[in-house]
Amino acid sequence: EKWALVQIDRNLSTSIAMKGIEALHRNDVPFHCISVVTADAMEQPERMYRFFRDNGITNVGFNVEEQEGINTSSSMQGSAMEEKYRDFLRAFWRLSEQDGYPVVLREFEQVISLIQGNARMTQNELNRPFSILSVDWEGNFSTFDPELLSVASDRYGSFNLGNIKDLSLVESTHTEQFRRLMADMTSGVETCHKSCEYFGLCGGGNGSNKFWEHGTLASSETNACRFGTQIPTQVL
């Protein structure tokens, strides 16, 4: 009975999402799709590709299932899954190539644009302070990765820097909490720069992935960066 209810809920949410896509098409509103990819998808690249193509979804990003928050593990962990993901992306690329590239995959597009422009990244908005500002419903705010807003940890306490009602953004940069987060974030990015040949294509990774996988911002390679940057680059 519980499984039946879950299936009904999934079918309903899918139906609503497809109606939304139809409305966007009717009104010529451009959009992109972010798809969470799990182990179940690895055997179905053609099915996924045709879904996007046949529904006119031309800009797609793959978010590989991550170890994050209450998700203490991922179905995509391990070298065997990394190889399956390579095969999955190769198949997706071939299918799109055969049709004249009607579906643009974010992971490929990011790498291609950097290579074509002979450009490389030195950091990114998820490890650069206040490129992103996240505020919760009570006014508590944080920077760097939005996934860290209001998260509590043994190492850092709360990732929040203060409350927007009584602390300015400038004032928050003088707090011990900000200095500690900034020091560890900088250390992690520098380690990536020194040790990883893919650094110029990602700019030092994401703090939330480093924290959830290694317990500290002062770390480097993650499962997330292998799937998000390294493997797509290898496939190209």
Model-derived segments and their meaning:
Residues 1-67, 74, 78:
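Radical SAM/AdoMet-radical enzyme domain recognition
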Residues 47-51, 55-121:
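Long, K/E/R/D-enriched contiguous segments that form extended
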Residues 83-115, 147-194:
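C-terminal accessory region of radical SAM enzymes
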Residues 126-129:
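Short, small/polar residue-rich loop motifs at catalytic or cofactor-binding pockets
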Residues 136:
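Short, acidic, Ser/Thr-enriched surface-loop or helix-capping motifs
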Residues 149-152, 159-164, 186-236:
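Radical SAM enzyme core and accessory elements
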